[in-house]
Amino acid sequence: MSTNTEIIKNSDLQSLINDKRRLINEIKDFNKSIKPLEFESYQDYFLIKTFKKGISASGHVDIDSLRNKEYGIYYKKIKRNSTQEVGEPIPRNTSSSSSSTRSNSSADISDTEYSGENTPTTTGAASRRRRTRSRAIQRENSLPASLPSISEANANNDDVTISEINGSELPFPIPISEVENIDIASDITERDGIRRRSSRISERDKRRSQSRLGSEEDEEGDGHDGDEGETKIQDLYESLVPKILESRRRSDWILPPKARYTPEKQMRTKPSFKSIKINELVGNKRIRSILSRFEGGVAGIRKRDWDSTQ
């Protein structure tokens, strides 16, 4: 019985050893069958490693060939639009005609209104264009009837009169006789233009964040309606070099010297210039005789070893 049990144990051990060897061989064969995702060639690998910013549609950029008179640099400056919207302050003109315009307009302010383009305000802020009577009437006629003018508002409110309006509270001083001809809409547009740039930017950011939140909520609602287990994978905008399953090893590719990348190296050579010492030059008699003809020619030069150099 003991011999039978020993034979069974040995057979079990041998079968385990054989299974282990078989699994090892299968793993080795499986590893050999795996083909990694690699680049197509060494040239594509070279393009990625030496990638530079430039103007290109496919991502393969040769910036040296792009440098010409049209594309000297790879970026363009973003300039603000020169056209100004209604209600924005008009920039100050620092020409010499500002003083003359101010003096002439102050004399004839009752008859003809002046334009505030060339007249700086006392507070130092950029002046805004004054409305004439014809402009105010045209603007009031073009607006809908839902926006009442100051004269209609004062007619409804008996407590407030035109004489009680303080001219210092307005954005620019206006005579009392001209207050009736300015409508509320023009004042609103001017006050919108006077607002700080930081407040306008913050309001714009708030509107953008609210729109983004609304779009995200819509996307989440659409996603819950579909299959919950399915995940949406978004591809990248552009693949620089596509990867393929059966690719050639990039280490087997060698570019010709003409296509290899050689970075620009700065020469580490220090230029050497020929120098002549003034004492050795003046030591010559002929040079000394020429310099002695001029005022202060040999003054301040050491007279040592003058006779040694002839």
UniProtKB/Swiss-Prot annotation:
This chain's source organism reads: Saccharomyces cerevisiae (strain ATCC 204508 / S288c)
Instruction: Give start-end positions of Low complexity composition bias.
Output: 92-106
Q: Which UniProt keywords apply?
A: Nucleus, Phosphoprotein
Q: Where is the composition biased (Polar residues)?
A: 107-120, 139-155
Task: Give residue numbers for the modification (Phosphoserine).
Answer: S215
Keyword check for Transport, yes or no. Answer: no
Q: Which gene encodes it?
A: RFM1
Protein name stated in the entry:
Repression factor of MSEs protein 1
For this chain's UniProt record, which GO biological process terms are given?
mitotic cell cycle; negative regulation of transcription by RNA polymerase II; positive regulation of DNA-templated DNA replication initiation; regulation of DNA-templated DNA replication initiation; regulation of sporulation; regulation of transcription by RNA polymerase II
